[in-house]
């Protein structure tokens, strides 16, 4: 990610992948462009069913195409270094679920104890308190993941969140 260069809204050309060195601080090889369509920022990576998943937030220039502004999209590949193929949208802009909470979208997708989750932020608390300033609150919801083929379906944003998995002591 890193913003949208002028005139390059559909293909910003700002995403790269590269192999990490064994020390996890160096790189091996040269970073390679992967070109997520309408990329804005907020990249994430997962491996599901042998597929490599690259998820990201789309930019604010998606009018006139099947994508929408500031939603979480994903691409898949058989290799962590690509090539990646656009595979769809998994989370709409938070303003879809929480009126008045539109904004850029940051997320993480992860599995815990056999259940898949998506975390994200929205301005729900700010709006309920009647204040402004772009204050974001964290949310977590379930996300449908097909672990046999690596596809991800759309998640729904809620204020209820998820059920407690277990008690801590």
Language-model regions, residue ranges each:
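Carbohydrate-active catalytic/glycan-binding domains of CAZyme proteins
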Residues: 1-169
